[in-house]
């Protein structure tokens, strides 16, 4: 049980880049689709007999505003989305704008957290 808690602690502390690498490893080496794993985990509580609403599995990350630290937000968008500097700046300047579309919940929340830490106002749709 202690091992499982240690693994959970490590997962919670992963950076966005590490989460992306983990998803790639799970997919390429073990054939596990990250979205499929999330669905399997989400389905388990419903199996206990509780009437659960269907959870949304695909999210759009929307940058509502860059806030006061626009440069930091541009850097964060550039790093997180793999864009060039000009593309990242244009995306931030066009706020409100969609940063990423159709991503799983974990990726969306990690991206939202990274952008908010840079000073942006972000929402998930």
Swiss-Prot record:
The keyword Phosphoprotein does not apply. Keywords: Ribonucleoprotein, Ribosomal protein. SUPFAM superfamilies: ClpS-like, Ribosomal protein L7/12, oligomerisation (N-terminal) domain. Transmembrane segments: none annotated. One of its GO terms (molecular function) is structural constituent of ribosome. GO terms for biological process: translation. Coiled coil: none annotated. CDD domains: Ribosomal_L7_L12. It holds the Pfam family Ribosomal_L12_N. Gene3D superfamilies: 3.30.1390.10, Single helix bin (1.20.5.710). Signal peptide: none annotated. The keyword Ribosomal protein applies. Forms part of the ribosomal stalk which helps the ribosome interact with GTP-bound translation factors. Is thus essential for accurate translation. Homodimer. Part of the ribosomal stalk of the 50S ribosomal subunit. Forms a multimeric L10(L12)X complex, where L10 forms an elongated spine to which 2 to 4 L12 dimers bind in a sequential fashion. Binds GTP-bound translation factors. Belongs to the bacterial ribosomal protein bL12 family. This is Large ribosomal subunit protein bL12. It comes from Porphyromonas gingivalis (strain ATCC BAA-308 / W83). The lineage of its organism: Bacteria, Pseudomonadati, Bacteroidota, Bacteroidia, Bacteroidales.
């Amino acid at each position: 049980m202690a091992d499982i808690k240690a693994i959970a602690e490590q997962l919670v502390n992963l950076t966005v880049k590490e989460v992306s690498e983990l998803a790639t490893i799970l997919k390429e080496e073990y054939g596990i689709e990250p979205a499929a794993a999330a669905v399997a985990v989400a389905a388990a509580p419903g199996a206990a007999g509780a009437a659960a609403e269907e959870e949304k599995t695909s999210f759009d990350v929307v940058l509502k505003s860059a806030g006061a630290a626009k440069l930091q937000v541009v850097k964060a968008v550039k790093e997180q989305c793999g864009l060039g500097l000009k593309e990242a700046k244009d995306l931030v300047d066009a706020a409100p704008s969609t940063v990423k579309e159709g991503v799983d919940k974990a990726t969306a929340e990690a991206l939202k957290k990274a952008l908010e830490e840079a000073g942006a106002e972000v929402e998930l749709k």
